[in-house]
Amino acid sequence: EISPRNLTLRQREFTQAELQIFFNPNKIKEHPDFNTIKNTKLRTLLIEDRKKGKVVERTAQELTKSGLPKFYIYHLAKIQEFYFDVLKVPKEKFRFYQLNDSEKAFYNKYHFDLEIELNEHGFTEMGGLHYRTDHDLKGHQKISNQKMEVLDESTGEKIIPHVLELSFGV
């Protein structure tokens, strides 16, 4: 969640855009279009990069070696593409900042903040990509006593979908 601080930069009254992608958790290790972005260099500050404090450009394929699944990495690449190609954010002012277990919400398995460097505030969170697992739907199922299972027609299995959430301050 984006919290209000830094005076006018972050106010309580602003628009937050969210996109939630529901998917079969058994398919998170793959994405049908991953090959189209596998050589894309992503500007990341992984947990292990923090001591150096330097953004490292890694290809999407290289990021799979850090344990991140292709489905998640694909969406990181598409977010970065949007910020570079549509919004024209300068490359050197952009990074994905990986949150560690004590920084991220307990229900997020993977969590990267999208940060943009602002002249007066340094790198500042502007959005994020959160893998929320099945936390939301299992909670709703428990409270409502309604099954949240769906049939994945491609595999024939019943699953509770997992959620990948993209959120951005507008």
Residue ranges and their predicted role:
Residues 1-170:
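TRNA-recognition modules of translation machinery and tRNA-sensing kinases, especially anticodon-binding
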